[in-house]
Amino acid sequence: MRPQSKILIHEKGWKVEIRDLRYFLSMSDAGSLSEAAKNLGVTPTTLSRQSHRMERELGAKLLIRKRGSLELTLAGKIMRSHARNILNYISVASDAVSRAGKDA
């Protein structure tokens, strides 16, 4: 079961949507804005805006944008690892709650 795109709020005040984490991972995996956009079924402009918004929210540059490609900064590599874990934890929790609800 795929969790809906809700906002995650960190105690320091930054807000990131679950969708933003998925978009970021797609960009980092594809290594290209246009390829990630194609895979996600959104426009490159949508991904570009999202990545800039996420960088502003976190206060760190995550991506190095080059002509036709993307590279992760050190902060981006750290975020990628945490984003994968966060999405995995959300999925596991969602599945566990769904199973528990069926048993009730």
Where are these regions (language model features)?
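Helix-turn-helix DNA-binding elements, focusing on the entry/boundary residues of the two helices
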Residues: S32-L33, S51, R65
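Residue cluster at the C-terminal edge of the helix-turn-helix DNA-binding motif
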Residues: A30, N39, R53-K61
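Interdomain hinge and pocket-entrance segments immediately C-terminal to HTH DNA-binding domains
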Residues: S98-A104
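A short LG(V/I)-centered, amphipathic sequence patch enriched
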Residues: E55-K77
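The N-cap/first-turn positions of alpha helices
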Residues: E17-D20, P44, G76, A83
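Short helix-boundary/capping micro-motifs
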Residues: M27-P44
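Short, intrinsically disordered or compositionally biased N-terminal tails of bacterial proteins
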Residues: M1-V16
